Each structure stands twice: as C-alpha cells, then as structure tokens.
Amino acid sequence: GQDSARRISEDARTWLPSGNRISNDRALRFSDNGRFLYFGTTPRRPEKDTTLLEDEIADVEVWTAEDARLYTQRNVQLSDDKKRTYLAVYNTQAGTGRQLASPEMPYEYLPRTANGPWIALYDDRPYAKQTMWEGYPGARNTEIVNLETGERKSMLNGEVTPVRWLEGGKFLVWYNQTDTTWNSYDPAAGTHHVLATNETGVFYDEINDRPMHPRSYGYQGTLKGGNKFLVADRYDLWELDPSARTPAKRLTRGREVDTRYFLRDLDPEDHFIDPTKKQLV
C-alpha cells in the first residue's frame, strides 16, 4: 500500500455526470476487502437568488389526485428527497471511478460485504400509485451492474420482488408474493431460476386473511460456501440451490406432526450456516 494520502476526487471529472458533484449527504463506505469505496453523487443545487425579497419568492404547493404519492407522504419525505444521492464507486486497485445509480435507477441492493463484482439497482417509483392502493412491498424494476466493467443487465421488471444477496454475493434470491415462488438470479450467467413452487410446498402464509398477496415464512440463512440457502414454510425448513442444479429439499418433518421448525441464530458474527455443525431450531 501507499504511505501517503492521495486526492482522488479530481479524477471524478472524467466519469461524473455533467452537472453533478460528490455529495456529503451519504457516508463513505469501503467494501470489506478494501477494493471498492462507495459514496454518493447528486446534481449541483442552484444558487439561491439573494436579490429577491421574501414576499417575492413563490411559496406554492400544488398536488392532484393523480400524484403517485400522497401530498402528506411527500411532505414527510421532503427532507430525504432533497438529500437524495446516487451511488458511485471508486476502484482502489484500478484507480477508476464509476457512476452506478442514476435518477432512472436510484436505489441499490448491496451485498453485506460490498466486495462485488456485482451490485443490484432498482426503481419502484413507476409503481408508487399501485403500491399506495395495494400495499407494500410494491412492484419494481431491477437491474444489475458489474463494478469492474460497468456492464448492466436488466433483471426484473414490474414484479413484486424485493431481492436480497446471499452471503458471498454470488446470487440474488427472492420470494415472489404474486405467484408465491422462491427464485434466484445468477449475475455472472445472467440466468433466472424458479426454485420452489406450490407443487414443491406451501411457502406462503397459509392463514393470511388480508386483502393482499400473502408473504412467505422467510429466508433462514445461507449455507457455508454461499451455494445453498434455507427458507421456511409454516412448519418446516427447506434447502434451496440458487443454481437450480439440485431440487428443493425438505430438511424437517414438522407438518406431519403439527410442529413448527425455525432456525435460531446463536452466533450473529458468523454470517453463514455450517451444515456440519448442530443448529438450534
């Protein structure tokens, strides 16, 4: 490593979108391996016109019934909206920066370690009005970005699919509330797999009595190595393979005896589940 500080923000002029600046409204974050530095950018704010008197400054709020967000919700979120930043990254090994998020795809899913080489971005605003009426979580568009090359791949469009990274960052997984399936996406291969359906088991809330799609019984953790993960139904634990090479496997037999099994995490410092060790359920 180097023994002195080096200013890297000067290089931003070569990749930062025109009219944008590096923002101080988002904390800096290094990936666990130190390779990537994440930060936020934002459009430059217009200079305040100091020549106008207070009564010459327009102070009018206009809203309609067609707005995607309620007027009251917009007011509550106004401060956050003003501080909105878009994720960017600096590769400490290559010495290069890259804009990741944008006004068109403003939100991100980062793996816990943020080590890359992929991250996911999403936008739920096109479906905000639908979500307001039907309830959260709402539909969203999702894409993935390669931190090294900048390659982008469209992953999902218009699906009610808040996704999560498996530990290790190899796969994205999610439960689709609309069709009640468990799914995965392999960024490297660009492939989507349906891992469990209603023919496999009943993974949706069986006693849901709300006027909305039923939620799942939950993700339970990633097995050591990052190539398998566990989910629950009402009674049992299941092992799913995000590569879809092996079928879903039920690990317990609680449904037959009306006994519910859920995994208890006794070591929050260990982010993987070691299948060779005893687990508390």
Please give the residue ranges for each predicted region.
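Beta-propeller folds
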Residues: G1-V281
